[in-house]
């Protein structure tokens, strides 16, 4: 059995930006404090929502190092360190481990279109070059590559492969991973609209976009389930379903950055090639947030 890095809701945290595109660390600090004070169980930095794909390597390493230092052990920090280049992923992962991240989150290599055997070789190389727990990240809608359940099983044999962030949307696949791996591979939902469903399949929680604006509520969806109150967990899931889906009316993290700006933080713009939402989607996000009482 592998103890999970965290249970509950880890926020896939945005990276606040200044208007010139540089990282706004003053606002980042305020936003991390808000997250921790409102129930977030882990900070997942430099993931998809943190715009890792548009950070230069030096910025990526700096953001992780700064985040670990600022969080200062208050909650676990999981650092997104994946790349489609194994060598690059190893380089960033080593930096994150040396900085003191509690775990590293490794997205599947994108664009290269490797095989399942190639995936095993990729993750094994990173595992052997680092010394911290690893969370696999399966998001085929973005990468074009799915981690098959049998591949997840093979990777679960590596001692520091702690779990998988499952964002395939395929619950049958999640069930198969659970069947093959049991407690040797922890599962976190990578989709906010599937938190309850994945908890039902043995999940430990969620790595969440929604937590950026509703940290306590997202934590509560998971925690009520873990406490044995499945009915309340399901009610909360149903209640926040519309809001969770509103965060994906455009490409993540465009809507959630808009939402974070609306609740009073200076999230700033996304970096190119991501651009702001059109007026229709902006209005929808704003009206949905009003429905939930997040803004007036």
Placement of each model-derived feature along the sequence:
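Active-site beta->alpha loop and helix N-cap motifs at the rims of alpha/beta catalytic domains
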Residues: 2-11, 15-144
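Short, amphipathic alpha-helical "lid/cap" segments that border enzyme active or binding sites
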Residues: 25, 29-32, 149, 282-289
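A general structural signal for well-ordered alpha-helical segments in protein cores
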Residues: 28, 60, 64, 89, ...
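Short secondary-structure boundary segments
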Residues: 47, 108-109, 167-168, 191-192, ...
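Surface-exposed amphipathic alpha-helices with a cationic face
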Residues: 64-72, 94-97, 127-128, 156, ...
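Short beta->alpha linker loops
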Residues: 81-84, 168-172, 190-193, 213, ...
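Ligand/cofactor pocket segment of small-molecule handling proteins
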Residues: 101-103, 110-204
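Structured C-terminal cap/extension of enzyme domains
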Residues: 193-296
């Amino acid at each position: 059995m592998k103890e999970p890095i965290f249970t509950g809701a880890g926020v896939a945290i945005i990276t606040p930006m200044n208007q010139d595109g540089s990282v706004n660390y003053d606002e980042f600090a305020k936003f991390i404090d808000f997250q921790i004070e409102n129930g977030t169980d882990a900070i997942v930095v430099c993931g998809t929502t943190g715009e890792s794909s548009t950070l230069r390597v030096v910025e990526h390493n700096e953001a992780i190092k700064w985040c670990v230092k600022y969080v200062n052990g208050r909650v676990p920090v999981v650092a997104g360190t994946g790349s489609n280049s194994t060598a690059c992923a190893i380089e960033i992962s080593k930096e994150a481990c040396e900085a003191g991240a509690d775990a590293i989150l490794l997205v599947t290599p994108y664009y290269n279109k490797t095989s399942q055997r190639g995936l095993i070789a990729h993750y094994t190389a990173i595992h052997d070059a680092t010394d911290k727990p690893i969370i696999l990240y399966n998001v085929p809608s973005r990468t074009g590559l799915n981690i098959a359940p049998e591949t997840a099983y093979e990777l679960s044999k590596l001692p520091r492969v702690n779990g998988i962030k499952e964002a395939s949307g395929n619950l049958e696949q999640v069930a198969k991973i659970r069947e093959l791996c049991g407690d040797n591979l922890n599962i976190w939902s990578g989709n906010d609209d599937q938190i309850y469903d994945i908890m039902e399949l043995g999940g430990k929680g969620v790595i969440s976009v929604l937590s950026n604006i509703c940290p306590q509520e997202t934590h509560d969806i998971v925690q009520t389930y873990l406490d044995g109150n499945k009915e309340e967990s399901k009610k909360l899931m149903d209640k926040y379903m519309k809001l969770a889906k509103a965060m994906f009316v455009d490409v993540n993290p465009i809507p959630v950055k808009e939402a974070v700006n609306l609740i009073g933080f200076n999230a700033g713009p996304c970096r190119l090639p991501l651009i702001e939402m059109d007026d229709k989607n902006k209005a929808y996000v704003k009206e949905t947030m009003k429905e939930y009482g997040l803004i007036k």
